[in-house]
């Protein structure tokens, strides 16, 4: 990109920013960087401009860069949720491509700033991840690259299993606190005479405390706090990895909403620009490529856009029933901003994917049968419920620690809350040894396989399967 093109881009950024503000978008200060493909794909693989080194990121970079070199896919931009918000543009983009991208990332930044799921996000995560990378590099120098990399392998295999509720009471309990004395009334009426000085002697009963007292979703935190295997440097790395995952988690919970919101606004903003005929044609092609539906999956840009457009249409022209509920005509845009603020993908789909929209967009459920894919259901509620199910827990299996002292031997017992989708057995058998590495004792995972309850265990020697 030459100097003249950079000046043109700067003018376009200023104009697009003013248009976005005029529409009511509220975003952090923006910082734009123009980067070559090598840099963009490095950021894409690592997830951030500054992050610790790991072989899995290199593998992802090679795959993405190869697809780019072969013309199979292309990343036009990357946007970082921070304050200020950073957007990285590919240096080979045309001016109209960059105009679309600037409008798109402004809407992303508005979403980051205003959606309730992002309210506890650390806005200085770029600097925080840079500090994490330095600390991990230090541990590699002290303990060896292989030792640290092996530990990172274990953490990254279960990194999604955190509790995204950042504000919650801290539970105080310990594996050493196995028994407590419970006072029982000598008679059913003792509590009625509790003020009497001559109370009957209490009976004392010893009872084993559950550990944890209730199922614990945050497996990383549980291991961090209670594993007897971890050294201080390992516990430190585990803490940092959990913090990074907490940063990424809201993006997993709002993927469809976020992309739909950005797609809606880049269309509206670009329409306000004075485009040449060539630019208008190129924009139409680019936009069609971004929001086109897929026959074999869900395009989050497309689905999110269609739901937001449907909200605007229905609330601009409310039915008599909606009017009785207090909905005012021409309130579509206001409702969209409200939805953007308070919903996640699950509630967004459950509350706003209507029967009419499912039928109009011809959404359906399909299944692979032999070599072919067959449509198995077109009922709108089935489609909606399946989409909601796919977004539960960010799309990852819901696991909880149910016992940290299983068999009274400090073994770890994890339960998979089965809801119709079985665990990937190949992945499960690879993850169990990593859990053993982190916990230091035998690890068990309860799940359902072929409609039968089954427990998978790893004792340091091999994976065993037992039907319950």
From Swiss-Prot:
It comes from the Bacteria. Pfam families: SpoVR, SpoVR_C. InterPro entries: Spore_V_R, SpoVR-like_C, SpoVR_N. Keywords: Sporulation. GO terms for biological process: sporulation resulting in formation of a cellular spore. To E.coli YcgB. Appears to be involved in spore cortex formation. This is Stage V sporulation protein R. It comes from Bacillus subtilis (strain 168).
């Amino acid at each position: 990109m030459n100097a003249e093109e950079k000046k043109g881009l700067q003018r376009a950024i200023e104009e697009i920013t003013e248009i976005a503000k005029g529409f009511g978008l509220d975003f952090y200060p923006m910082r734009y960087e123009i980067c070559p493909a090598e840099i963009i794909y490095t950021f894409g693989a690592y997830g951030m401009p500054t992050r610790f080194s790991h072989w899995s990121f290199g593998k992802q970079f090679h795959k993405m860069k190869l697809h780019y070199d072969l013309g199979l896919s292309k990343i036009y931009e990357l946007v970082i949720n921070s304050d200020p918000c950073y957007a990285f543009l590919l240096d080979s983009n045309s001016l109209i491509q960059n105009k679309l991208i600037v409008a798109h990332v402004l809407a992303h930044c508005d979403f980051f700033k205003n959606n309730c799921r992002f309210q506890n996000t650390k806005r200085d995560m770029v600097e925080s991840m840079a500090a994490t990378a330095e600390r991990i590099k230090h541990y590699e120098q002290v303990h060896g690259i292989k030792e640290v990399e092996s530990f990172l392998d274990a953490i990254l295999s279960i990194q999604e299993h955190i509790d995204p509720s950042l504000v919650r009471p801290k539970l105080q309990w310990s594996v050493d606190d196995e028994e407590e004395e419970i006072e029982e009334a000598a008679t059913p009426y003792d509590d009625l005479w509790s003020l009497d000085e001559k109370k009957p002697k209490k009976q004392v009963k010893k009872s084993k405390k559950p550990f944890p007292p209730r199922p614990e979703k945050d497996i990383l935190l549980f291991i961090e706090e209670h594993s007897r295997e971890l050294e201080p440097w390992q516990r430190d790395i585990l803490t940092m990895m959990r913090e990074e995952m907490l940063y990424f988690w809201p993006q997993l919970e709002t993927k469809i909403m976020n992309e739909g919101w950005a797609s809606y606004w880049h269309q509206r903003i670009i329409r306000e620009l004075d485009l040449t005929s060539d630019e208008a044609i190129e924009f139409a092609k680019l936009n069609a490529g971004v929001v086109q539906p897929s026959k074999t999956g869900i395009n989050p840009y497309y689905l999110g856009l269609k739901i937001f457009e449907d909200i605007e249409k229905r609330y601009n022209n409310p039915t008599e029933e909606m009017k009785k509920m207090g909905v005012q005509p021409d309130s579509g845009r206001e409702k969209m901003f409200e939805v953007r603020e308070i919903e996640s993908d699950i509630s967004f789909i459950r509350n706003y994917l209507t029967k009419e929209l499912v039928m109009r967009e011809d959404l359906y459920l399909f299944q692979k049968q032999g070599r072919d894919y067959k449509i198995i259901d077109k009922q709108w509620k089935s489609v909606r419920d399946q989409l909601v199910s796919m977004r539960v827990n960010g799309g990852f299996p819901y696991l909880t620690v149910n016992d940290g002292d299983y068999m009274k031997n400090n073994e770890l017992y994890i339960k998979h809350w089965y809801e119709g989708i079985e665990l990937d057995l190949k992945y499960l058998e690879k993850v169990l040894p990593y859990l053993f590495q982190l916990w230091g004792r035998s690890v068990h995972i309860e799940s359902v396989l072929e409609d039968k309850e089954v427990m998978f265990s790893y004792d340091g020697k091999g994976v065993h399967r037992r039907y319950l």
